[in-house]
Regions:
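C-terminal alpha-helix
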Residues: 81, 392-399
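Conserved PLP-enzyme active-site core in the AAT-like
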Residues: 1-22, 26, 53-67, 72-279, ...
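Conserved C-terminal alpha-helix-loop-beta "cap" of PLP-dependent enzymes
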Residues: 3, 311-392
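Glycine-rich phosphate/diphosphate-binding loops and the adjacent beta-loop-alpha structural elements
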Residues: 267-270, 290-297, 374, 379
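A structural motif shared across PLP-dependent enzymes of the aminotransferase-like
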Residues: 20-32, 42-51
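Flexible, glycine/charged-enriched surface loops at secondary-structure junctions
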Residues: 45-50, 64-66, 247-250, 294-303, ...
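Active-site pocket-lining segment
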Residues: 277-339
Length: 399
């Protein structure tokens, strides 16, 4: 077996949490067992995806589901499905779609680097609205009528980045889009927990919703979920699966795709680069069952205790420690370490850099460094790492 050390790497203390750049969330033993079991057996992938999709549909309250190669892959596949449907010619031409509708309307304030996944399928964005609060120009944000005003014969759909503060409200956007027969693709990659979002976002009327499988669900980091309308999920599936078969032998389960809707056998679609292994499907489905049943809830108290250990070890340092979060939020508690930069003579960025460069390397949450605060998330830490982390931070704070 090849280890990280064999490759010349030193494993870090991940005090950041389930972020992609550090490898995602820890997979529970049952998820790892499912992955290994899947590795030793073989099934047709269209049958596996059909069965998994039925269970995803049950848990999300949607018509159909698909296991994808991450939430970004869900967005690319969802976009491709909206652009093409079951039109084999369009499927063949992606990402070149100049001769059919390919524009997605999006709130200007919801643009991000992640929406490259939508553009990768060939879509073009039409931006609407302003966040005049952020620009210090007023009190208004994007409003639903602005979406509708941007709809033209070139509009294929609407893209919406879901969050607790997203504006305008998703139901208002959906209502405007559906007036014109336009589907709405929702990016909800990081919106789990709470568990209820698995079904509540789609219940608002979204046509397709994408979730991450390697964060709160704690499946393989390279997995995600796409769920929603049966016809769109079916289109996404045939643009992802291996289509190297004879037409008279290809027999996908009707729960996945109705062959009668196809004029022939598609060639490999744009989603072929986003394939998912059988092991990943089994592992993701195992993790999804654990997540949706609340099996992870009992870990909150253990995580809180780790943070208490870290905070106690930093008593008397040039920092103030505050444990944030509640069990009701269904998220791991976090420890905010507000550094007295004047007393220390170093900035939070300096401390963060020192933690990464030390032994063992430590990666902390960096979202509040500009405010002089380190954030510790215990999700990816073990109990024996808490004292070591406290020691390392203490060293950087002058101890």
């Amino acid at each position: 077996m090849t280890s990280y050390q064999d490759l010349g790497l030193t494993p870090i203390i991940n005090a950041t949490g389930a972020v992609t750049r550090l490898g995602g969330a820890p997979m529970p033993p049952a998820v790892l067992e499912a992955f290994c079991e899947g590795a030793g057996q073989w099934v047709p992938l269209e049958q596996l995806q059909a069965a998994a999709g039925q269970r995803i549909a049950e848990l999300t309250g949607t018509e159909a589901g698909l296991v994808t190669a991450g939430s970004a892959a869900s967005l690319t596949l969802g976009t491709a499905a909206i652009l093409c449907g079951f039109d084999l010619g369009r499927i063949e031409r992606l990402p070149h779609c100049d001769d059919f509708p390919c524009e997605f309307v999006i709130a200007r304030e919801q643009r991000s680097g992640y929406d490259h996944a939508v553009r990768a399928a060939g879509a073009r964005f039409v931006e609407v609205g302003f966040n005049e609060i952020v620009s210090n120009a007023g009190v208004r944000r994007t409003e639903a009528w602005e979406y509708e005003a941007a709809f033209t014969e070139n509009t294929a759909g609407v893209f919406y980045g879901y969050g607790h503060d997203s504006q305008p409200p998703l139901p208002e956007v959906i209502e405007r889009a559906h007036r014109h027969g336009l589907p709405v693709l929702v990016d909800a990659a990081g919106e789990l927990p709470p568990k209820r979002n698995l079904s509540e976002i789609a219940a608002l009327g979204a046509d397709l919703v994408g979730f991450s499988g390697g964060k709160a669900i704690r499946g393989p980091q390279s997995t995600g979920i796409l769920c929603g309308r049966r016809d769109l999920v079916a289109s996404a599936a045939i643009q992802m699966l291996d289509m190297d078969d004879h037409l008279n032998l290809w027999d996908p389960p009707p729960e996945l795709v109705d062959r009668e809707q196809l004029d022939g056998l598609p060639r490999h679609g744009i989603g072929r680069i986003l394939k998912v292994s059988k092991e990943e499907v089994l592992a993701l489905m195992t993790a999804l069952e654990l997540f949706s049943s609340g099996a992870y809830d009992a870990e909150w108290s253990e995580q809180h205790a780790r943070l208490e250990t870290i905070a106690a070890g930093l008593s008397g340092r040039a920092a103030t420690c505050t444990i944030e979060g509640s069990i009701e939020a269904e998220r791991s508690p976090t420890l905010a370490i507000a550094i007295d930069e004047d007393a220390l003579g170093r900035t939070a960025f300096d401390v963060c850099r020192g933690l990464r460069d030390g032994t063992p390397p430590v990666y902390v949450g960096h979202g509040r460094l500009a405010q002089g605060t380190l954030v510790i998330n215990p999700l990816c830490m073990s109990d024996d790492q808490a004292p070591e982390l406290s020691r390392r931070i203490g060293e950087e704070l002058g101890g």
